[in-house]
């Protein structure tokens, strides 16, 4: 029976990871649909590259930084060389007792690594959307190396690796803070250095609309993300081969779906009330906001409570997008609002839905946001001192497809 349970839980972890991996396609389609047509090929290239970089960097160093043998603030040096051997040995196919599990899971270490690495790529995908339309590719990929290999794993250890947040009772089931707030804080740091797209703001500071190139493509991206989120949240139960875990996974799936639905409806109703029209881009961000909001605790609430959590997320993302835009934060896809601002709400909502400690949750969001923002800001400033991270006005005029890639996504449309 133990072998059957091990096999089923391992299979479940791998399949959940595959669903989360498919979210990379969702982010790609969402971003490609919400940017201008002259930047679409660059978006596709960027997402292919960042996913691959995340996988390699997490294998080389991120995994052992996030799950070291001990310490309270991350395995910066402790056990580094032995951990490299363990990490690079993931492909050996040896059983767990011969490889050595980092924290005693009941499925293979290879499955654990795969499930973890797609979360890393998700965090970096959040940055991709926020900097769309004006960041050069090489600096972006250099930043991806540092975020996925070092910044994300260090703060990830604080919670999931047994670090100080875990020890003080911080609760974040699937990563509203650890993944989404981390990605959004990094995105905010990069955007702060990068500045807005050319023509986004008038000389008087007025906001100029820059509509996306393909709304159906963006909507497809949201549907893919919605589907992938069942693996993101459901897989975080880490087991399915017992009656209790099967019921828990079912509840997580239910709540994930209901929260996204609540976010969509809230954003649609609010946009109708505020503008007289239903804004489809706000509805898409409402879905993502609902998903992010419930990610910190998709298990404890009832289905009705999950709808409420998602709806609040939909309201928050609506006003946050407008507020940040007016403050000069140019975020073409609303990633900082949907993943960052709503991520904070999701973590703090666990105080009500899951009975978590208010102070532990507050310290968690502050620690993750500050560390990630400051570290990312420093890294971006260093990269910018070596090479310009921002495309010139002329390059933005012709589009990054031409200036960075050399292949236009829509050559027939001029």
Positions of PLM-derived features:
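Hydrophobic alpha-helical transmembrane bundles of multi-pass membrane proteins
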Residues: 1-414
């Amino acid at each position: 029976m133990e072998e059957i349970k091990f096999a089923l839980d391992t299979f479940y972890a791998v399949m959940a990871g595959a669903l989360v991996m498919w979210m990379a396609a969702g982010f790609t389609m969402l971003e490609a649909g919400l940017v201008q047509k002259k930047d679409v090929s660059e978006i596709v290239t960027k997402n292919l590259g960042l996913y691959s970089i995340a996988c390699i960097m997490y294998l080389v160093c991120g995994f052992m930084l996030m799950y070291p043998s001990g310490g309270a603030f991350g395995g910066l040096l402790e056990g580094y060389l032995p951990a490299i051997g363990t990490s690079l040995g993931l492909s050996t196919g040896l059983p767990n007792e011969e490889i050595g599990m980092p924290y005693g899971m009941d499925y293979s270490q290879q499955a654990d690594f795969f499930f973890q690495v797609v979360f890393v790529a998700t965090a970096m995908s959040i940055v991709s959307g926020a900097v769309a339309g004006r960041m050069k590719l090489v600096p972006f990929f250099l930043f991806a190396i540092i975020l996925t290999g070092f910044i994300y794993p260090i703060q990830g250890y604080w919670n999931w690796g047994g670090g100080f947040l875990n020890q003080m009772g911080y609760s974040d089931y699937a990563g509203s803070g650890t993944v989404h707030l981390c990605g959004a804080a990094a995105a905010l740091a990069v955007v702060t250095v990068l500045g807005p797209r050319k023509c986004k703001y008038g000389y008087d500071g007025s906001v100029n609309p820059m509509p996306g190139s393909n709304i159906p493509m963006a909507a497809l991206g949201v549907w893919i993300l919605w589907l992938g989120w069942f693996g993101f949240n459901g897989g975080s139960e880490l087991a399915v081969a017992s009656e209790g875990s099967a019921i828990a996974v079912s509840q997580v799936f239910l709540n994930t779906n209901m929260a996204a639905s609540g976010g969509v409806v809230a954003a649609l109703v609010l946009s109708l009330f505020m503008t007289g029209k239903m804004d489809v881009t706000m509805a898409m961000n409402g879905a993502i906001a609902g998903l992010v909001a419930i990610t910190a605790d998709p298990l404890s609430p009832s289905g009705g409570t999950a709808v409420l959590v998602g709806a609040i997320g939909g309201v928050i993302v609506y006003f946050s997008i407008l507020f940040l835009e007016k403050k000069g934060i140019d975020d073409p896809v609303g990633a900082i609002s949907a993943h960052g601002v709503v991520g904070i709400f999701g973590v703090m909502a666990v105080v009500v839905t899951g009975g978590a400690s208010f102070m532990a949750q507050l310290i968690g969001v502050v620690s993750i946001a500050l560390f990630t923002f400051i570290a990312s800001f420093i890294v971006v400033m260093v990269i910018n001192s070596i090479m310009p991270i921002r495309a010139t006005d002329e390059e933005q005029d012709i589009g990054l497809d031409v200036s960075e890639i050399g292949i236009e996504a829509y050559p027939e449309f001029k």
